[in-house]
């Protein structure tokens, strides 16, 4: 899941942080691909509007 898509969905970084119960600073430290645990939680919080994409977190062997 990409940080840009998440922020586009929620409108602001602060709204993302509030939805996850984390700090704005934590969200600001995300890279382009957000942490896997947060992606999974966001799929649940958004009732599937944002999708956890397992392949984004698997490295090629």
UniProtKB/Swiss-Prot annotation:
Keywords: DNA-binding, Early protein, Repressor, Transcription, Transcription regulation. It comes from the Viruses. It holds the Pfam family P22_Cro. Disulfide bonds: none annotated. InterPro entries: Lambda_DNA-bd_dom_sf. This is Regulatory protein cro. One of its GO terms (molecular function) is DNA binding. Cro represses genes normally expressed in early phage development and is necessary for the late stage of lytic growth. It does this by binding to the OL and OR operators regions normally used by the repressor protein for lysogenic maintenance. The gene is cro. It comes from Salmonella phage P22.
């Amino acid at each position: 899941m990409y940080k840009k898509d998440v922020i586009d969905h929620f409108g602001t970084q602060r709204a993302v942080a509030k939805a996850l119960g984390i700090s704005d600073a934590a969200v600001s430290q995300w890279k382009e691909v957000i942490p896997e645990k947060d992606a999974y939680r966001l799929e649940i919080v958004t009732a599937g509007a944002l999708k956890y994409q397992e392949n984004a977190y698997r490295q090629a062997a």
